[in-house]
Amino acid sequence: DLGTSAVKLLMMDENGNIQKIVSKEYPLYFPYPGWSEQNPQDWFAQSMEGIKELTSECDKSQVAGISFGGQMHGLVALDKDDQVIRPAILWNDGRTAKETDYLNQVIGKDKLSEYTANIAFAGFTAPKILWMKENEPENYKKIAKIMLPKDYLAYRLSGSFCTDMSDASGMLLMDVENRCWSKEMLDICGITEEQLPKLHESYEVVGTLRPEIAEELRFSENVKVIAGAGDNAAAAVGTGTVGNGRCNISLGTSGTIFISSEKFGVDKHNALHSFAHADGHYHLMGCMLSAASCNKWWNEEILGTKDYAAEQTDIKNLGENRVFYLPYLMGERSPHNDPDARAMFIGMSMDTTRADMTQAVLEGVAFGLRDSLEVARSLGIQIDRTKICGGGVKSPLWRKIIANVMNLKVDVIESEEGPALGGAMLAAVGCGEYPDVETIAEKLVKVVDTIEPEPELVAKYEERYQQFRKLYPAVKGLF
């Protein structure tokens, strides 16, 4: 799982037993306000170190396949010599407001939706390509290959220039309904299909290890490399959110609400993304750019502590907090599509406590996720329960808040590994251990706890949420 702050590596046997987990961190760079970049070489170096540590005590001849979940939307540009042209521009980078406006207003949202089933968001890949064309023309002219983050790893490991349908959906370059590149979008961005990777389903084998990689890792050259999926689709596989009408909420660095569907569908208001799913079907997804990262920022940067649980012990009266928090540290995607939006606290008084502020952060993220749920409900999608994954799931209090803010039964699954487990499950399908993604999800995903919404608390949070909805429109002019 190639995340924003670290790569998590997981080793699973053919029966779904997790043998070992390793995590390797790498830096994130903010060279200018609103920018967010990483060095792809850091991803590769840490992944290689992680694989060596992960397999240090196993019979390496038994390694059958490698697959991926990964942060989406990032632009990795290589030249004709396969050298990285510039640092990768990440999913949470907000520099492309001008290019996003051009796509939505000049090309037009209706045309974009016709070409790709989506409109432009600042984090998507196509606006980043246009930004390079306008601001770094010499770098733009050097582009021979355009990749997404996890696909850079696949290329370094296997030599296969490829991507999968779920991750490619978030580039704004793909005709999602027909699962192919959009000629119209390529023309708009001034690129050719030769500069883009070959499209695969997430469970398909794209190649085997390069000989020099196999030698360094002491693996067989026959180890299969499977396409993998964008982190949210991989997490959905890892939580069993496949097939028709199932929901998963991810509380990672970003927050998502993910609804699987066997049929292609589009939100006509474009507040939800319409993407291909890793199971070969489709999904709708709402994405907020700052979720667990809000809690990390509040605890570590403001309070100066890493003991998140201790900060939550004094939170007592759920649904009665008078402080609101708008969770827009990096702008916002769903449903506002506003890269200039910013976080703020509202409603403090002399008796506001540290615990009130901590509670407001947890509730603000839950309210932000509910914004996307309300869009899904407006489309007639009936949801009464959801799986949940991501780092924020470790907080029982946050799980309870989400269940009652959303008025959903929240199923906690046995494994907390989300995208990494989903990647391993896709590898198992690609290696022929299971016939399809639905079968392995049915066999391996186990629910260990369910949080039931409490009617009295649901009513309190309903009132609070209706107040929350008024805040962004009221303060938007300040950004």
Each language-model region and where it sits:
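Two-metal-ion RNase H-like nuclease active-site motif
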Residues: D1-L2, I249
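N-terminal glycine/serine-rich phosphate-binding loop of ATP-dependent small-molecule kinases
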Residues: L2-R86, E114, K142, A214-E215, ...
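Residue-level signal for inorganic ion chemistry
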Residues: G16, N39, I66, D93, ...
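A generic structural motif
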Residues: E25-P27, W91, L289
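Short beta-strand-loop/turn "lid" adjacent to the catalytic site in phosphate-handling enzymes
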Residues: K52-W91, I119-T125, A154-D175, K198-E201, ...
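Short, acidic/small-residue loops that bind anionic groups at enzyme active sites
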Residues: R86-T100, I413-E414
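Active-site core segments that coordinate phosphate-bearing ligands/cofactors
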Residues: A97, N104-I119, P127-C162, L172-K183, ...
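A conserved beta-strand/loop element that lines the FAD pocket in flavoprotein oxidoreductases
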Residues: E194
